[in-house]
Amino acid sequence: MEKFRVIGSDKPLVGEVTISGAKNAALPILFASILAEEPVEVANVPHLRDIDTTMELLKRLGAKVSRNGSVHVDPSSINEYCAPYDLVKTMRASIWALGPLVARFGQGQVSLPGGCAIGARPVDLHITGLEQLGATITLEDGYVKAEVDGRLKGAHIVMDKVSVGATITIMCAAALAEGTTTLDNAAREPEIVDTADFLNTLGAKISGAGTDTITIEGVERLGGGKHNVVADRIETGTFLVAAAVSGGKVVCRNTNAHLLEAVLAKLEEAGALVETGEDWISVDMTDRELKAVSIRTAPHPGFPTDMQAQFTLLNMMAKGGGVITETIFENRFMHVPELMRMGAKAEIEGNTVICGDVDSLSGAQVMATDLRASASLVIAGCIAKGETIVDRIYHIDRGYDKIENKLSALGANIERVSEAG
């Protein structure tokens, strides 16, 4: 099993990072390609384990899939309609195959998925949405099965809870439904907008993505097309926090400040000098004092839960401590005990963590528990005294494209080592 060995330093992280395409847009877009009857090309797709798994799943369904810079998918040859357990057991995103399969082929089944262990992420909202579009759903032998005679039917759907995943499932399925679907209380994340833009490129008629009401006029078929995946706002935020906690200056290229306004506002509140351009963001913490900030996670455009772990670290290193409240997922403070092994001070009370401030961290052996928590541990290792070993880094490989190379380019001393190393 691979690990990261990080030798900490008081030297600030300085330089430029090219941000990859967003995993949380690339995954639903690749699954949405099932809806097309002609080849599609998806550019700016990150090199991640979940992307590789999705490409393999599309191949297993019968699609022709290749990668040469962009990912090319020809879904015209799909002749299987089941996403099997051996492929989806590590990835919750696999549920996104269900809507496109039943919408285009009248049937689909997906093994109940796996992924990060960060609380309840039920597929109920996906199932309810598909049922409201006319699908018959059954649960058998660990599989969710969806069927419909003819086409799905447009409907007025009011979501019980704001859900990014279910919003995408319903939007994709409704694209080929008969009639118009109105989706109220929809999630507003940029990755939903990007998925809608992709579908519209193929001939879908979707409006309102990015607001809490999305309207989908169903069409009979979708053709081919080319799409460029939106920048990864969470990877962007992660490197900006790395600059802040190390007292450095980092410029993120190939990104968009409009995607993470809540994060940039908190970085400025923390004392960072934030500058932005059309496709870049910089954070400069040189000779500036890091100040604690209070964070409350919320659906977009609020503060993203996927940046909570990174700001937990920031608050631990800032003057005054800080309070972070997690409202999206339960059980998402598993990074806190690991950071405390490195000398951080914190107290967890329910869905809130109260951070104490410390002058420095010490290297330790720590364990990654989920995707974003692992990023905070790696950054902590970069600024700690001594050697930090981060175990179970397969979590980080699910969401960060070559993070060790990008950190090394900023001056970090980090390497990937095998168990024997």
UniProtKB/Swiss-Prot annotation:
Annotated GO MF terms: UDP-N-acetylglucosamine 1-carboxyvinyltransferase activity
Q: Which GO terms describe its cellular component?
A: cytoplasm
- Which residues, renumbered to this chain, carry the PTM 2-(S-cysteinyl)pyruvic acid O-phosphothioketal? C116
- Enzyme class per UniProt: transferase
**What does this chain do?**
Cell wall formation. Adds enolpyruvyl to UDP-N-acetylglucosamine.
Q: Which family does it belong to?
A: Belongs to the EPSP synthase family. MurA subfamily.
State the name under which the record lists this protein: UDP-N-acetylglucosamine 1-carboxyvinyltransferase
Q: Which organism is it from?
A: Vibrio campbellii (strain ATCC BAA-1116)
